A protein has these predicted regions:
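Core structural elements
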Residues: 13, 64-70, 75, 177, ...
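Duplex nucleic acid-engaging cores and interfaces of nucleic-acid transaction enzymes
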Residues: 88, 92-95, 129, 157
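A glycine-rich phosphate-binding loop feature that marks nucleotide/adenosyl-phosphate handling sites
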Residues: 264-273, 319-322, 339-347, 362-371
Length: 420
């Protein structure tokens, strides 16, 4: 059986595939869609009505629900619009994604790293590092303007029709692409373009839409990496970089009906650009990009803002999740220069937060005593200096030293690195 023939509605609805899809949706959690049903409520609904839903899918009559529009802040500023499907539609999309990925992933470009099995952002950065080590030290950054909102439905469906023989699957994908977007004010917006982020099927459709770009760049012999809509080309000279930027921009407009963001697209030496939060230097060393460090500092300030309504225990749990995820991602960079200084800055914000949370002289006195401060050191509880200034006081510093913070579960990045 060919890969094209393997993609059928029966394969998508197979019991084992649906069970794996439900486990994935449950594991990913996520907010309810327009119908406001949770995963548990949807599971109960499916127990009662799955036979009818399955029959509609098999007959090609199933109609997806509207998607809920959600605006989230982008790290570099502005907002990104997500389209959150109902849990039931997330389940069906996930089942489709599993079958389509199994059949089509092997035919995709080796230069594509985003949202694919056994590939990661770290693999993309490592490939880019190899290009730089080979002497390709000029980078072409291509930023696709509102890519997920601008995918041309007709072109995408034409591409899919060459890969999927089952008309029911094609029709279902088309309905998901056209599912209306429900705004916060209740108005519904028809969709004629785009595959909004938020559903399990969107990343795969995005990769399929950009696969012709991968093939064109490979045909030209260009060194490049692509992670979803982040595209970076590597050349040996500034002249070649500028030529490729102009050429690829024109090709994208003509062949894929996509525009580039001129403010964010451009050329430069490798150390001047960033890729997926990392900066690759001419020596081949990898460091954290400046913007990524700024985002970390913003997040730290948010975490340790004393005005948060979270309890200390809740802060601890969230901090452990955050710093663990941050470290797992950025530990691949060379952090020796920044890590110790950065950790000291983080610890100062922690001390500031606790000083504010102790509220007044009595609260600070009792807290310092519990932390082992004795005698004259306890007089600091009555100090009238501001919290940021007090965060460097020798008594507060000793009371909330690294070992104490570790004991409270407030691990620092340099501790994770084994640099006690």
């Amino acid at each position: 059986m060919s890969n094209t023939e393997a993609i059928t509605i029966e394969a998508i609805l197979a019991r084992d595939n649906m069970c794996r899809a439900f486990a994935a949706v449950k594991r990913n959690k996520g907010a309810p869609g327009v119908d406001a049903k949770t995963i548990e409520q949807t599971a109960e609904h499916l127990r009662r009505h799955w036979v009818t839903i399955r029959d509609e899918l098999l007959a090609g009559r199933y109609q997806p629900g509207a998607v809920r529009a959600v605006e989230i802040p982008k790290p570099q500023g502005g907002t990104r619009r997500l389209g959150i499907p109902n849990v039931q539609d997330r389940l069906i999309q996930q089942a489709m994604n599993q079958v389509l990925t199994a059949a089509l992933d092997s035919s995709m470009s080796e230069h594509s790293y985003g949202f694919r099995p056994n590939r990661s952002a770290h693999d993309a950065v490592e490939a880019a590092r190899r290009y730089v080590k080979q002497g390709k030290k000029w980078v072409v950054d291509i930023d696709l303007k509102q890519f997920f909102d601008q995918v041309n439905h007709d072109r995408l469906m034409s591409m899919l029709s060459r890969k999927i023989a089952d008309k029911r699957v094609l029709a279902l994908i088309g309905r998901y692409l056209r599912a209306p977007m429900r705004q916060a004010n209740g108005q519904q917006q028809k969709r004629r373009r785009g595959t909004p982020q938020g559903g399990p099927l969107s990343p795969l459709l995005a990769n399929l839409y950009l696969d012709p770009l991968d093939r064109e760049l490979a045909r030209r012999g260009i060194a490049f990496v692509r992670y979803a809509d982040d595209v970076a080309l590597f050349t040996s000279s500034e002249r070649a970089a500028r030529r490729q930027l102009d050429s690829v921009k024109g090709w994208l407009r003509e062949q894929l009906d996509l525009d580039t963001n001129d403010e964010k697209s451009g050329t430069g030496r490798c150390g001047e650009s960033q890729l997926l939060g990392f900066c690759i230097h001419e020596t081949g060393d990898v460091s954290i990009a400046g913007k990524a460090l700024l985002r970390l500092k913003e997040r730290v300030r948010e975490f340790w803002d004393a005005r948060q309504s979270l309890t200390t225990r809740q802060l601890q749990a969230q901090w452990q999740r955050f710093v663990g995820g941050w470290w797992n991602y950025f530990s691949h960079a060379n952090l020796q220069k920044d890590l110790h200084t950065l950790s000291g800055w983080i610890r100062r914000h922690m001390r500031k937060c606790f000083w504010q949370r102790w509220h007044d002289r009595a609260g600070r006195y009792n807290a310092l005593r519990r932390l082992g401060v004795k005698g004259r050191g306890l007089k600091v509880a009555g100090c009238r200096r501001g919290a940021w200034a007090m965060s460097t006081h020798v008594v507060v510093n000793q009371a909330l030293k690294t070992a104490t913070l570790n004991r409270f579960g407030l691990t620092l990045p340099w501790v994770l690195a084994g640099r006690m």
